[in-house]
């Protein structure tokens, strides 16, 4: 679907300030994204989520991430993620390809 190398660059530029993506990695301002794919919203152990994230009740996958990453506050009103989103579909596809590759168990 997307390009993993391009996705890595997007992660470094737009995500790494607040997120890690490594097994056993620490939470930053945002949760460690390792194991994100297939996990329900608000479920990274040891991270303090808003009720909005905990109660959304969806499982992260390509489709849900495509929608969320376009406009996080619209997808989960009340989230504390301050990122405005990635409007370009191709960039979202690249980022998701990277997340699936680098952050999967």
UniProtKB/Swiss-Prot annotation:
Keyword Cell membrane in record: no
Gene Ontology cellular-component terms listed: mitochondrial intermembrane space
Broad class of where this protein is predominantly found: mitochondrion
InterPro entries referenced in this protein's UniProt entry, alphabetically: Cyt_c-like_dom, Cyt_c-like_dom_sf, Cyt_c_1A/1B
UniProt cross-references to SUPFAM superfamilies, sorted A to Z: Cytochrome c (SSF46626)
Keywords, alphabetical: Acetylation, Disulfide bond, Electron transport, Heme, Iron, Metal-binding, Mitochondrion, Respiratory chain, Transport
Superkingdom of origin: Eukaryota
Disulfide pattern: 21-103
GO molecular function terms listed in the Swiss-Prot or TrEMBL record: electron transfer activity; heme binding; metal ion binding
Posttranslational mods: Binds 1 heme c group covalently per subunit.
Residues reported in the UniProt entry to bind heme c: 15, 18-19, 81
Annotated localization: Mitochondrion intermembrane space
Residues with PTM N-acetylglycine: 2
Family, similarity comment: Belongs to the cytochrome c family.
Function as written in the Swiss-Prot or TrEMBL entry: Electron carrier protein. The oxidized form of the cytochrome c heme group can accept an electron from the heme group of the cytochrome c1 subunit of cytochrome reductase. Cytochrome c then transfers this electron to the cytochrome oxidase complex, the final protein carrier in the mitochondrial electron-transport chain.
Name listed for the protein in its UniProt record: Cytochrome c
């Amino acid at each position: 679907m997307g390009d993993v190398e391009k996705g890595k660059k997007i992660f470094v530029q737009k995500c790494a300030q607040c997120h890690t993506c490594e097994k056993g990695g620490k939470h930053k301002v945002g949760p460690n994204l390792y194991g994100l794919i297939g996990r329900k919203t608000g479920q990274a152990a040891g991270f303090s989520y808003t009720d909005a994230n905990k109660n959304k009740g969806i499982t992260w996958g390509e489709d849900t991430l495509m929608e969320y990453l376009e406009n996080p506050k619209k997808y989960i009103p009340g989230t504390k993620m301050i990122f405005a989103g990635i409007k370009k579909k191709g960039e979202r596809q690249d980022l998701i390809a990277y997340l699936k590759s680098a952050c999967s168990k």
